[in-house]
Swiss-Prot record:
Record HAMAP family: CTU1
Matching CDD domains: CTU1-like
Organism domain of life: Eukaryota
Keywords, ordered alphabetically: Cytoplasm, RNA-binding, Transferase, tRNA processing, tRNA-binding
Protein name, as recorded: Cytoplasmic tRNA 2-thiolation protein 1
Function in brief: Plays a central role in 2-thiolation of mcm(5)S(2)U at tRNA wobble positions of tRNA(Lys), tRNA(Glu) and tRNA(Gln). Directly binds tRNAs and probably acts by catalyzing adenylation of tRNAs, an intermediate required for 2-thiolation. It is unclear whether it acts as a sulfurtransferase that transfers sulfur from thiocarboxylated URM1 onto the uridine of tRNAs at wobble position.
Principal location: cytoplasm
Organism: Drosophila pseudoobscura pseudoobscura (Fruit fly)
Keyword flag RNA-binding: yes
Family: Belongs to the TtcA family. CTU1/NCS6/ATPBD3 subfamily.
InterPro entries according to UniProt: CTU1-like_ATP-bd, CTU1_C, Ncs6/Tuc1/Ctu1, Rossmann-like_a/b/a_fold, TilS/TtcA_N, tRNA_thiolation_TtcA_Ctu1, UPF0021_CS
Molecular function, one GO term: tRNA binding
Amino acid sequence: MPINCKAKCGKAAALKRPKTGDALCKECFFAAFEAEIHHTITSSKLFRRGEKVAVAASGGKDSTVLAHVMKLLNERHDYGLELVLLSIDEGITGYRDDSLETVKQNRDDYKMPLKILSYEELYGWTMDRIVSQIGRSNNCTFCGVFRRQALDRGAKLLCVDSIATGHNADDIAETVLMNVLRGDTARLRRCTDIRTGGGEDSIPRVKPLKYSYEKEIVMYAHYKKLVYFSTECVFAPNAYRGHARAFLKDLEKVRPSVIMDIIYSGEQLRFKDTAKNPVRGTCNRCGFISSQQPCKACVLLEGLNRGLPKLGIGKKSKGDRMIAKQDQELALRERANLVKNDF
């Protein structure tokens, strides 16, 4: 016997919402999913009329659903936003080159301008080349740092007021877990923020999908027949986040509400005054936002260019010793060449 839609629309239920457990027809699920994102946007005052917003587009399910829903809500509720797509090409063969084709399809489907920036044009390196130098143990560190700065650079080029990213509820719960396990209070106190950055030298980032379950995003994309790229990054299986994700999935089997429980717990955390946030300024080399001098992106890039790919991994003092040792070796070689030339 078919189950009726809980919204009492008179139709048979087609699915069970992972977030609430409600049995809904497709149309009522779409309405509920979109209404929740609209509530997140309006209650958190993420945008103001007349603003230009860059939607961070990777071609995956999250960014595709974000672009679709942002366009739909912008028109339905008259937000008055100018929407553009911003995509970063990390240079990962067999992954990003294929997903960019999906991004271009999103551009055509949603009639949004698209800007693509590559690591190669920004840093002179691709992730394929970086991994060939460092192996697969720390590749996500390089990619994450470069990607964050690349989005800032792209946003500055496009003169946008904010960047909307596709971080969903699962992503944020995973990040809370990771920061707890690492004892990183500085990141823990801000990882649940729906808006980060902002100020004179940085462009704010917002998360309209903060309270949207990953399973529901997949269901929405499936039933809406949205075009998205579903292949996982070839370097992702080695990431530390994967362990937090697996742990979270196990917890979810026992307690379905665990994702929202973790997010709400993260939002309610209180820290002693002694646990200070890092002071954010601008990098004295590249001029982009940073809490250290030089910024992490510049340190990692210097390591690659010097042939010391592990320079930016670990404590700053370790990197300083590596630079000092290399400079000393170069000085000794130059001195030896001078002596040789004298004879």
